[in-house]
A protein has these predicted regions:
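Divalent-cation
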Residues: 1-177
């Protein structure tokens, strides 16, 4: 009886392991789907804000926790939908000047203050919004979208680099990447 119990135990741990692997794979795929789900409303909001020349700064958490930055602004939790994103950055909104922070596929804060990149020759022509995006991208692995008020141009900062004046197609690729 002992041998059979042992073999049964071995079999069940093996089964358990493959089940766990399957569940983890499903969770990863679900996470990816959830991440993809926020891209469409973000894209729509960005296209509208760029067209209306509404300035915006949106930081999307990746691996490194953005909670400390979220707490520099107004903390709340809301689903990512285009109208809400646009309303927050609307000129008369009390939160329009700061950054929006997105984590776990939800908006977790707005009106946040981000660390500003040092002034270098590289970014001497950048405005405060772009320098803040660059600063956060130097300190974290967040993906950051910037929309300029002046020209309604879309830029994207990631890992200390800023891609300026990109198309919405390019933005989508950078968000999905």
């Amino acid at each position: 009886g002992e041998l059979r119990k042992m073999l049964t135990a071995i079999g069940s741990t093996r089964r358990w392991r493959s089940l766990k692997r399957l569940l983890n794979k499903e969770k990863r795929e679900q996470d990816l789907q959830d991440e993809r789900r926020i891209i469409a409303p973000l894209m729509l909001a960005c296209m509208n804000m760029a067209r209306k020349k509404t300035g915006a700064l949106i930081a999307i958490q990746q691996g490194i926790d953005l909670t400390p930055f979220a707490h520099t602004g107004e903390v709340f939790r809301a689903e990512v939908n285009a109208r809400l994103v646009e309303n927050i950055f609307f000129k008369n909104s009390p939160l329009h000047d700061g950054a929006m922070v997105i984590a776990d596929n939800s908006i977790i804060a707005a009106g946040c203050i981000l660390p500003v990149a040092y002034n270098t020759d590289l970014n001497k022509d950048l405005g405060l919004r772009h320098r803040s995006a660059l600063g956060l991208s130097q300190e974290t692995d967040a993906k950051i979208i910037i929309i300029s008020e002046e020209r309604g141009r879309i830029s994207f900062a990631y890992r200390g680099e800023i891609h300026q004046d990109i198309t919405t197609d390019e933005l989508q690729l950078l968000l999905e990447g």
